[in-house]
Amino acid sequence: MRIVALAGGIGGARFLRGLLAAVGPQDEITVIGNTGDDIHLYGLKVCPDLDTVMYTLGGGIHEEQGWGRADETWSIKAEMKEYGVGPEWFGLGDRDFATHLVRSQMLTAGYSLSQVTEALCVRWNPGVRLLPMSDDRVETHVRITDEQGTRAVHFQEYWVRLHAAVDAEAIIPVGADTAKPAPGVLEAIAEADVILFPPSNPVVSIGTILAVPGIREAVAAAPAPVVGLSPIIGGAPVRGMADKVLAAVGVEATAEAVALNYGPDLIDGWLVDTADEHAVAAVEAAGIACRAVPLLMTDVEATAEMARTALALAEQVRHGS
């Protein structure tokens, strides 16, 4: 079975770990990773979501944080601070720095982000084919109003420095409108047997991937069933700031509203948590097959069961049952 998953960072990576546990060695998983979170720091290109997927599936992630490297040290950051060089609010550890140095060196030498990502994955052996959504530069910005007035800030600043404490007024995936899907992205979607939307942020993760011209259209036109898992449980995000960015695009922070925002033209099936069982009827009335099942990724086995349920729903959709 050929499975394609569109994924952001922590939530996407943890779901993918469960998916790997749920499938067999004969199954092929292609992950189309969000690069809208990418940021340039200290002259280096940092790809937080790609790296989180790579580290998580490769066994190098800081489990408690869900991002960054295990057994990290911070000597470089401390030295940068002594030079008065920031930003202090964004933590890059020494081990993590090495990844960004290799990436930036290869990009400067003329390799594409796709080629660099493939090379980095040779070390980590994540068990999936990891593709960036685009080789072109796309960065998600958030329009806010604070004591400095109305302005746009990089998504990383909005989330890491401001902790999403200010309302998001608009989400702007800068560069997405002129970006092209990375090599292999459209082909993977067209050839997939199943397409999955993990419980990643529907606006700044999956939404940004879909903003690259051609990707949304390819998913909508794909013969494979498309099944998503709600990142919202009981009217609140499991983690992160999905409620803030959903409000910015005029969508309620409910499992039902997120499904309807994707729409029946894009997704065929939708899983909600048992806490949101009341949403099933409304989602199905819109033409999207819906089931209520436990969606908390408490451990790998619980997550694997979520993945198995998503794949089972895809089969039901495929056979019209």
From Swiss-Prot:
Belongs to the CofD family. Pathway: Cofactor biosynthesis; coenzyme F420 biosynthesis. Homodimer. Catalyzes the transfer of the phosphoenolpyruvate moiety from enoylpyruvoyl-2-diphospho-5'-guanosine (EPPG) to 7,8-didemethyl-8-hydroxy-5-deazariboflavin (FO) with the formation of dehydro coenzyme F420-0 and GMP. It is an enzyme of class 2 (transferase). Its EC number is 2.7.8.28. Gene3D superfamilies: CofD-like domain, CofD-like domains. The gene is fbiA. 7,8-didemethyl-8-hydroxy-5-deazariboflavin binds at residue 51. One of its GO terms (molecular function) is LPPG:FO 2-phospho-L-lactate transferase activity. Its cofactor is Mg(2+). Keywords: Magnesium, Transferase. This is Phosphoenolpyruvate transferase. It catalyses: enolpyruvoyl-2-diphospho-5'-guanosine + 7,8-didemethyl-8-hydroxy-5-deazariboflavin = dehydro coenzyme F420-0 + GMP + H(+). InterPro entries: CofD, CofD-like_dom_sf, FbiA/CofD. The lineage of its organism: Bacteria, Bacillati, Actinomycetota, Actinomycetes, Kitasatosporales.
